[in-house]
């Protein structure tokens, strides 16, 4: 059909109906990002990082929704030593203390402003997370396990507090392509910002602000992967990713789309296809 003007108008109308029912508070978003940055300072990380949890099993793939997290997970999980666990809620639940009644009134990141609210439980949080992960894996031969919940970008400091040896991969994509793809996706209420383009741009700017902070703190412990680079130079970028995960190269990582594992993601049909270029600079079709 290629009637892009009509298409974007239809998306606007449909999303406006959803947006009218879901309030997105920009002030709350900004305050949350401010608090995360202020609480999880370099000094804070160095003081509380748990050196007694040496596990190198965990790989976290995170970033904005629709930025390529599923593609990267599929490449890595095609490796014989890797289990892709999908999008898991455990980090968010533990960070907010949802499993502990006494902390139910203290949410993330405010819970971490007072060490009495988190320090006694940090080691337990790490154990709980690993136990949950290992129940999913149930295979002693697996060396690495992937959690690809995109929203874990908010919890990178918490992740490194528990697991200093974790591998964190942040996916990037053309910002306009990312935002349009989010706008076109029929997300649930967990993405209230996604139904209005102005709110979406605001949210994305706050996301970038936080990620730039995390990179300044954990630069040598994170890998930034650009979606467009993966599409245009798949083999070289895939080898770089596998090396970052401390794994030996396997050619099957380039044939990830042949895997029969179940994948629950907004990109579900795409993981059954070879890498394609049609999503690159897709926003050009919609003008300004």
Q: Where are the regions a protein language model picked out?
A:
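PAPS-dependent sulfotransferases, especially Golgi type II membrane carbohydrate sulfotransferases
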Residues: 1-59, 106, 110-143, 162, ...
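Hydrophobic/aromatic beta-strand patches that form the interior of the parallel beta-sheet core
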Residues: 59, 83, 167-169, 223-225
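Glycine-rich phosphate-binding P-loop
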Residues: 60-78
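Short beta-strand-centered segment that lines the nucleotide-binding/catalytic pocket of NTP-utilizing
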Residues: 83-95
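Conserved nucleotide-binding/hydrolysis micro-motifs of P-loop NTPases
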Residues: 89-91, 173-178, 229-231
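P-loop NTPase switch/communication element
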Residues: 94-112
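Acidic, metal-coordinating catalytic cores used for nucleic-acid/nucleotide bond scission
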Residues: 150-151, 229-234
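ATP-dependent NMP and nucleoside kinases share a basic, alpha-helical "lid"
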Residues: 151-173, 178-179, 245
């Amino acid at each position: 059909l290629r009637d892009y003007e009509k298409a974007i108008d239809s998306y606007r109308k449909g999303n406006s109906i959803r947006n009218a029912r879901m309030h997105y508070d920009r002030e709350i978003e900004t305050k949350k990002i401010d608090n995360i940055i202020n609480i999880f300072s370099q000094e804070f990380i160095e003081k509380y990082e748990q050196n007694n949890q040496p596990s190198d099993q965990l790989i976290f793939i995170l970033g904005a929704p629709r930025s390529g997290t599923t593609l990267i997970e599929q490449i890595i999980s095609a490796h014989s030593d890797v289990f892709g666990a999908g999008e898991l809620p455990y980090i968010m639940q533990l960070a907010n203390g949802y499993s502990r009644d006494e902390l139910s009134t203290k949410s993330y990141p405010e819970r971490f402003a007072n060490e009495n609210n988190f320090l006694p439980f940090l080691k337990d949080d790490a154990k709980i997370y690993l136990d949950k992960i290992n129940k999913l894996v149930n295979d002693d031969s697996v060396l690495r396990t992937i959690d690809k919940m995109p929203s874990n970008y908010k919890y990178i400091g918490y992740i490194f507090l528990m697991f200093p040896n974790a591998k964190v991969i942040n996916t990037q994509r053309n910002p306009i392509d990312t935002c349009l793809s989010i706008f076109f996706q029929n997300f649930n209420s967990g993405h209230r910002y996604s139904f209005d383009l102005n709110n979406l741009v605001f949210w994305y700017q706050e996301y970038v602000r936080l990620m730039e902070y995390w990179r300044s703190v954990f630069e040598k412990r994170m890998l930034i992967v650009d979606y467009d680079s993966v599409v245009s130079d798949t083999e070289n970028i895939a080898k770089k990713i596998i090396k970052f995960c401390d794994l030996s190269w396997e050619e099957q990582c380039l044939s990830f789309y042949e895997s029969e594992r179940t994948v629950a993601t907004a990109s579900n049909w795409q993981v059954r296809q070879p890498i394609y270029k049609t999503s690159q600079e897709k926003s050009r079709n919609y003008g300004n």
